[in-house]
């Protein structure tokens, strides 16, 4: 977003509050522009030149979009709103862009690991779209040792049957049409991480419903734990559960390059 904009819109854009709440904050005299209090929500500001300060929030530079990597703990829904606990509830209330953030993709409630949270709809769409075949890496713990022959099957791609009957109510009509037939998975990369051959690193380039669990389930294995450790060039690294960090410039540029946005 460039050029002159209203002050209340500016506050909404940086995630300080909703538009209605932003108006209340401004009228209450809690906002300064270039060191002076402003009471008019329609006051015009230049994001590239003016300094806007909001009482109770750290000074937040204006930017078009926000990009974070987030460690989703087990037990939370990958959604912005739900009856059950969601990832948004874990984020700091003064996180820049919070009101407009959404997850680019999902992780099951019982899974953990890396999510990308953003306000950039086009980037999120490309992360999730099968056309771009963005690699995602997981650490997977199985209930029993995997055989070399099964590793080879996964590396060549396997046919997945329809999801079990219990899963069907969870799917939208469109999603049901996408999984209610047999389709071969794209070749996966498998790396054995432990001598007992139960702990693996699995890299896939598609995001079908419960893909990892269904791949191993087809071969007779149960996934005991699932942790995503990378999405393309973005790594989970040393992030702690429920922690969010802005993507580095290098991470963002590399991600956009892979997704054809540069």
State where each predicted segment sits:
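Basic, flexible Lys/Arg- and Gly-enriched helix-loop patches that mediate nucleic-acid binding at interfaces
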Residues: 2-165, 175-262
């Amino acid at each position: 977003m460039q050029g002159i904009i209203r002050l209340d819109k500016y506050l909404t854009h940086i995630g300080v509050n909703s538009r209605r709440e932003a108006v209340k904050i401004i009228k209450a005299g809690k906002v300064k522009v270039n060191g002076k209090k402003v009471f008019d929500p329609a006051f015009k500001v230049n994001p590239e030149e003016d300094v806007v300060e909001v009482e109770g929030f750290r000074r937040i530079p204006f930017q078009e979009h926000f990009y974070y990597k987030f460690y989703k703990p087990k037990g939370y829904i990958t959604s912005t709103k739900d009856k059950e606990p969601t990832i948004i509830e874990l984020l700091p209330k003064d996180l820049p862009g919070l009101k407009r953030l959404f997850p680019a993709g999902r992780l099951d409630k019982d899974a953990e690991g890396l999510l990308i949270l953003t306000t950039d709809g086009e980037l999120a769409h490309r992360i999730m779209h099968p056309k771009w075949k963005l690699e995602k890496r997981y650490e997977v713990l199985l209930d029993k040792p995997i055989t070399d022959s099964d590793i080879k099957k996964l590396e060549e791609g396997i046919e997945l049957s329809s999801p079990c009957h219990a899963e069907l109510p969870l799917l939208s009509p469109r999603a049901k049409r996408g999984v209610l037939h047999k389709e071969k998975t794209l070749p996966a990369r498998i790396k054995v991480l432990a001598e007992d051959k139960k702990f693996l690193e699995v890299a896939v380039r598609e995001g079908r419903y419960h893909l990892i669990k269904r791949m191993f389930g087809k071969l007779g294995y149960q996934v005991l734990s699932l942790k995503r450790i990378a999405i393309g060039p973005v790594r989970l690294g040393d992030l702690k559960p429920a922690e969010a960090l802005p993507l580095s410039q290098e991470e963002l540029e590399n991600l956009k390059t892979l997704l054809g946005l540069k």
